Amino acid sequence: MWPQPHLPTHPHLPTHPHLPTHPHLPTHPHLPTHPMMSKETRQSKLAEAKEQLTDHHPQTNPSVGTAASDTKKKKINNGTNPETTTSGGCHSPEDEQKASHQHQEALRRELEAQVQTIRILTCQKTELQMALYYSQHAVKQLEGEARDLISRLHDSWKFAGELEQALSAVATQKKKADRYIEELTKERDALSLELYRNTITDEELKEKNAKLQEKLQLVESEKSEIQLNVKELKRKLERAKLLLPQQQLQAEADHLGKELQSVSAKLQAQVEENELWNRLNQQQEEKMWRQEEKIQEREEKIQEQEEKIREQEEKMRRQEEMMWEKEEKMRRQEEMMWEKEEKIRELEEKMHEQEKIREQEEKRQEEEKIREQEKRQEQEAKMWRQEEKIREQEEKIREQEKKMWRQEEKIHEQEKIREEEKRQEQEEMWRQEEKIREQEEIWRQKEKMHEQEEKIRKQEEKVWRQEEKMHDQEEKIREQEEKVWRQEEKIREQEEKMWRQEEKIREQEEMWREEEKMHEQEKIWEEEKRQEQEDKMWRQEEKIREQEEKVWRQEEKIREQEEKRQEQEEKMWKQEEKIREQEEKTREQEKIREQEEKIREQEEMMQEQEEKMGEQEEKMQEQEKMRRQEEKIREQEEKIREQKEKIREQEEKIWEQEEKIREQEEMMQEQEEKMGEQEEKMWEQEEEMQEQEEKMRRQEEKIREQEKKIREQEEKIREQEEMMQEQEEKMGEQEGKMCEQEAKMQEQEEKMRRQEEKIREQEKKIREQEEKIREQEEMMQEQEEKMWEQEEKMCEQEEKMQEQEEKMRRQEEKMREQEVRLRQQEEKMQEH
């Protein structure tokens, strides 16, 4: 609330002691008589007021002005005729009673209308309280749901942390498996080298065996030849025994025995050599069998490791499936959270709207109270000013009694000029008040704009925090992807090593084939043996090929895993792109919502301004009524002046009018009664704007007490006449204060001009904001075109966006129409 302009109050104006103070209504200052006035002055003042009511009111009797002028002419022409002075300005009591009765009826009607408005406001208040209660209950429920969702979110975050730990454990297991695979590949390389060496040694041994077998065959052939020779020699010996003499036989027998010994020794030596070669062959075969057993054991180990790897892969797949399921649950929970947050936001918006309505009602009530206080203070100040002016005029009349008859026309002209000046001043005051109210409304609008900007900033901070969280998650995903890429690079290096080993094996096979071709060119009898050896080699090669096929299968599985990972990565990238697009769309939708909220707030502001304009028009009507009342008061003042002139004439002719004083005293009593009625009406008018029907009874009691006080004041009026001179001196001081107030008014006018300049600057800013909104709309159109090119599924959302843009355009047209209406209303206000 902006501070209201302070109205100067009289330093000797205490509050009325008999008026009760309501806790929600400001105290009404009572206007008692000045304590420094004497009884004589008070009595003279009462007499003058009583004489004021003797004249006819201009609205009830239009012939009052003519009668007053006729009495003046008669006084000028015949100063000795006292009847003309009293009979012309008399007012019938029946007319006064009718006027008072009509005035009371009008006041009662106004009271009834105010009572109805109060009842309507109380009904609205109860409805708003009920709506507030239900909204608070709903907010509490939503707070409970929000707490549950927050707890679920915390649980989900914990679960996500556990999943990350499980992922890290799986990654470590995968690293261990990779290391174990590397070790196995190294062992496999070593075994392949040993196989290669063993194959080479086998070939060498086979060659040696072939040579030894050839030698054995030669030895056996020689043995058979020797045996044949021995048999022939034995036959020869037998023949020789028969033919030759014994000496020759002995010599030949000795010679043959020696040859047999030598041949038998050679045979034994060859047999021993053959046994050695057989033993060596057996040892080599045993080594080969042992190596084959070792190879089989290693193959079994490799198969077990492959089974373990498969089990780990299955576990990985299961964990990945669990991760996907958990991620889907997380997404569903997040969607539920978004929906509930949207509901909470809607309820918060409703609560804010209700709070705004309450604040507006409270502000209206406070403004009405302040305005009523200001009106009362202004009325009191006006009453005091009028009294001061009356006193000044009385002083001037006393000084200018001798010159009044000559300066009547000039005085009337000056009074008219003063009245016009007063009216102009009052109009300027009303305009300044209207400007001040407009400024207050502008300041309120600024405050609302600041509040909206703060809300927008808070929302942007939330969005930025969410984006930072998303960026952190993306960085984590990228780190995981980098780890996967590193693992894939290691696997590729291993594959390259395998390819190199396979190339070496192929080179060895080519060498074997060349050697086979060389062996095929050899003898035919060796082919059978070689075929047997080749069968063995083919079996070994088949085993090697089976191992290679297993390695190929493992590599294919690894490639498939890599392809699956790549597909998963591509899916993740696509999902991230979709999420980013959805985030962009949500941001755009949030911007559109913010724009719609701004437009709604502007529409509400426009409605409030229209309501305020209606209130201002009502106030203008009330002000016109007040002006009419002031005009009536001025007419009464003119009549009072005429009556004062008559009183002065009567003072000159007091000795002649002593007989008619008694009649005037009777008339004065009637006028006193009428004055009491008028004062009651004035109090009712002042207290009707603030108090309700229940307080009217208290006011009536106070009015009765005031009537008693008025009677006491009639006795003290005479004392007030003595104090008039002292008050004349104070009037000069008050005139100086009036000059100071005029200077303050000029300063206020300068402030008003500055505020008008600020208002123009605000209008420029508003136009700039409208241009920005148009630029944003153009950007939205460009984004929509891009969205048409990117995805066909977003066509429905784009149609919705177009509908929202059409709504925005309609709202802009409505805003423009409202601006045109506001300008027209401002022009009307300026014309008024």
UniProtKB/Swiss-Prot annotation:
Residues 1-107, 303-333, 351-431, 508-652, 664-832 are annotated as: Disordered. Residues 163-828 form a coiled coil. Keywords: Coiled coil. It comes from the Eukaryota. Residues 13-27 have a biased composition (Basic residues). Residues 59-69, 77-89 have a biased composition (Polar residues). Residues 37-58, 92-107, 664-684, 692-832 have a biased composition (Basic and acidic residues). InterPro entries: GOLGA6L. Belongs to the GOLGA6 family. This is Golgin subfamily A member 6-like protein 24. It comes from Homo sapiens (Human).
